[in-house]
């Protein structure tokens, strides 16, 4: 994407591109007659994932591709399985984009390990923006499982 130098315009363009990507992916799934659930973000129950007495694993750099779900049911409506945003996530998403554009150091996301990856507890917009920017990894506080 060609950057204009105007942070708000760049953020708006990036968000539009990300939401178009989500719509295209949904259309492709419909044309292939795949169930809609395939595109939905998995929702995990934190109580089932976290065991009593477990210790946090600390802050680690984790692959974005390993993030496979969320702990918040409401976030599953704002993002698809690939963390592409819905149009309702715009304002916050653009603020995160602008912060990264300006070089701000954002706090690590919070995740809980799942069977094969991680579920996001906090930082859904940061994950979405990082993916839209083409990042391969993200700093995360890995909570006890």
What are these regions (language model features)?
Residues 135-137:
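Ligand-binding loop in jelly-roll beta-barrel domains
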Residues 140-145:
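Long, charge-dense
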